[in-house]
Amino acid sequence: MARLKPNQDLTESVEALCRQHGMKTAIVRGAIGSLIDAHLQYATPNGPREMEINGPGVEILNVFGEIGFSDGQGNPHPLQGVVADTDGKIFAGRFVRGANLSFITIEITLQEWVAVKQQEAVPA
């Protein structure tokens, strides 16, 4: 469990937390809080598009995804989620890196994913 302070980017902060605690792979189990504005990406037949949900005070309803670093490279998995604007209208998509700043705070729950070798697995 971690708390992001005001003006910290959601994606970049979660990645930094994982690095700080030596997590090579982690799963976001949930988050609550608010964003100044939300910037989400979504798929269309003509390719990805972005939308901006204006705040301040865009509420986070759910965040999910996997954080993983392979061979020292960046995280190829964007976080996804659901947010509500100040009128209660709901939006979903991938959070755009560097564009989703915490308004007051965001509390987020991460679980480290530790790979188990086949011979170490416990039979069912």
Regions picked out by a protein language model, each given a short descriptive name:
Residues M1-G30, I36-A124:
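N-terminal intrinsically disordered, cationic/polar leader segments
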